[in-house]
Amino acid sequence: MKEKIGWIDNLRAVACLMVIMIHTTTWYVTNSKAVGEHTWDVSNLLNSASRVCVPLFFMISGFLFFGERSAQGRHFLRIVLCLAFYSLVGLAYITWLTPISEAISIKHLLQKPVFYHLWFFFAIIPIYMLSPLIQVKAVRAGYLAVVTLVLAVLANPNTIDQSVGPFHWLPLNLYLSGDSFYYVLYALFGRAIGMMNTDRRGISWLAGVVFFASVAGIAMGTKKQMAINGAFADTWYLYCGPVVFIAAVSLLVLFKNCLNRPLPVLTLISRNSLPIYGFHALFIHFMRTHHLDHTDQPFIDIPLVFVITLMGSLLLALGLRRIDKRHLVS
């Protein structure tokens, strides 16, 4: 069990870092006309490599709660308290440090998160609610491969339309709709892969190759789609998209096989990942909107914004943990 917790902690920490990287590079990928092509390519690559972060969070939750152990009342309480607490933090930030109307944020509180990154707390609630009903069985790798091919690729509503003349053949219509189905599927895969013996000869290399190929596919697909549309399009960035799904599965296998021992820095980030997630967007938004960044020097700006955001969020997280002795929101 310690081995399993080791790779889970490392994976959670890297997913947390990826979230920060996505929001750090978003300005560049959505403002292609304001940045050079080389800068946009690098930002797009970093963003593409980080798109698996949200799927990984769902997979981790599935691994933890879709087995013998299910989410308990204290887990539901913690999610609700986190949503309330970080919404209040976001509301305070909006009120005091932005011209955004807090009244609108309050009015739509149950339909739209106060701050954009808090949507995840809403999305994870159904996973927790379903967990007492689900206990994933051990399955073969071949079965998961078929499920991935059919549900995550061929019948995925986010798969780009393909036709031969008047004959439309992709995506298949299996009446799948909505992101929530794929969030549950990620959780199911997290548990299934977590129980599977994946440490076989060549599997880790294959997982690594598939992950890097998927990242390249996301990056190149995004650039091609931007050329077609004449503006940035997130078609290939979607968390429930087929290539992101494959990338997330391959990275999970890679971490499970190769990073199953505790690493001090990643352990620290993992332990504080919840408040880091809750605070990080405020740092990035403040720097971007108060001209404290250096977008004219992107290769200084990106690592600087990333490090300041990580360190600032980590310091707040450590401070919050000293106050929140029961770790209800930290």
Show where each model-derived region lies:
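Kinked, hydrophobic transmembrane alpha-helices enriched for aromatic residues
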Residues: 3-36, 59-62, 78-98, 123, ...
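Alpha-helical transmembrane segments and terminal signal-anchor/GPI-anchor hydrophobic tails
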Residues: 198-267, 272, 298-300
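Membrane-interface helix-boundary motifs at transmembrane edges
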Residues: 2-5, 66-77, 130-143, 192-206, ...
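Hydrophobic alpha-helical segments with transmembrane-like composition
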Residues: 57-59, 64-66, 93-195
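Juxtamembrane loop-transmembrane helix junctions in multi-pass integral membrane proteins
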Residues: 3-6, 24, 38-45, 71, ...
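Interfacial loop-to-helix transition and helix-capping segments at the boundaries
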Residues: 42-53, 107-123, 160-186, 219-249, ...
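C-terminal "closing" transmembrane helix and its immediate cytosolic amphipathic cap
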Residues: 256-270, 281-330
